[in-house]
Amino acid sequence: MGVEQILKRKTGVIVGEDVHNLFTYAKEHKFAIPAINVTSSSTAVAALEAARDSKSPIILQTSNGGAAYFAGKGISNEGQNASIKGAIAAAHYIRSIAPAYGIPVVLHSDHCAKKLLPWFDGMLEADEAYFKEHGEPLFSSHMLDLSEETDEENISTCVKYFKRMAAMDQWLEMEIGITGGEEDGVNNENADKEDLYTKPEQVYNVYKALHPISPNFSIAAAFGNCHGLYAGDIALRPEILAEHQKYTREQVGCKEEKPLFLVFHGGSGSTVQEFHTGIDNGVVKVNLDTDCQYAYLTGIRDYVLNKKDYIMSPVGNPEGPEKPNKKFFDPRVWVREGEKTMGAKITKSLETFRTTNTL
């Protein structure tokens, strides 16, 4: 049996019970689904193509800045206008094209800090309008990252929004503890090292507050991870996720070995064993952004370097002064090279996360 057998909707954007069943199946079968940050139709189809060819589910997500870029850099982001419109545009685009790839897709929004809550509000309003018309939210899930705030404010704000989301059977991802580095709206580059490791009690406090509302939530607990790539050693300790599972299991008194759905942030540069340790301890989603950005660049960079004598002018190249160069500078040609290398990176990650051939 594979993923398709446990889903009501086999292809395209999945929501509600299907999202919960997908993550449950992933946890039980010890694989994680990569979440790819998309900033354009090009990056979206690169991810969809890689997942299709690997017979895998995929998560596509927009960050606050990525959503604004999707809308167009010429649009003002005052009041989160561009980020709201861009996220909604990306969602509708992905909903329209994803079924053509024949795989299940989770449509997600990435880190939303306190100062970005107007963006979250705008997306939720779009969800509720879509729900009123179609009986399901526009997005499968959203993430609140209030890790800069006190745990009390973090959790209480998540509770407030989660009640609203639960009415649409929507998934919530939240972050407790600090992931190092910098991500849209949250900068923890100078965080104290001890703060980079979430404690079991913190995780249980989240579970205790959210589970009575709905079981549809996941927790990004910090274990020394950092967003982006940084020189020097990063002391990742994904094994501590087992302590979170054990503590919550004992507090709840449940028989389920891993009651928590966990998320791996800041995975750039992590080893295969570190990923596997996290996945074995309940990680069902791994964020991929920095590595994919660089992979996308490499295809375009190498194309430009290899074809430089064919793209210096519209006409004239080493084959002759009158030879046209349109087939070399056509964006459909060189952008495609970025899609190929980004797709190759995602394909490799799907293998690392044990997601390949899970459909």
UniProtKB/Swiss-Prot annotation:
Residue sites binding Zn(2+) 2 per the record: 145, 175
Catalytic reaction list: beta-D-fructose 1,6-bisphosphate = D-glyceraldehyde 3-phosphate + dihydroxyacetone phosphate
Sites of Phosphoserine modification: 56, 63, 76, 83, 96, 147, 268, 313
Details of cofactor binding: Binds 2 Zn(2+) ions per subunit. One is catalytic and the other provides a structural contribution.
Signal peptide: none
Source organism (scientific name): Saccharomyces cerevisiae (strain ATCC 204508 / S288c)
Name of the molecule in the record: Fructose-bisphosphate aldolase
Annotated positions of the Phosphothreonine modification: 11, 150, 179, 290
Lyase found in the keyword field: yes
GO biological process: canonical glycolysis; gluconeogenesis; glycolytic process
Family: Belongs to the class II fructose-bisphosphate aldolase family.
Catalytic-site annotation from UniProt: 110 (proton donor)
One Pfam family in the UniProt entry: F_bP_aldolase
GO molecular function terms noted in the UniProt entry: fructose-bisphosphate aldolase activity; melatonin binding; zinc ion binding
Binding site for D-glyceraldehyde 3-phosphate: 63
Complex and partners: Homodimer.
PROSITE patterns linked: ALDOLASE_CLASS_II_1, ALDOLASE_CLASS_II_2
Pathway the protein contributes to: Carbohydrate degradation; glycolysis; D-glyceraldehyde 3-phosphate and glycerone phosphate from D-glucose: step 4/4
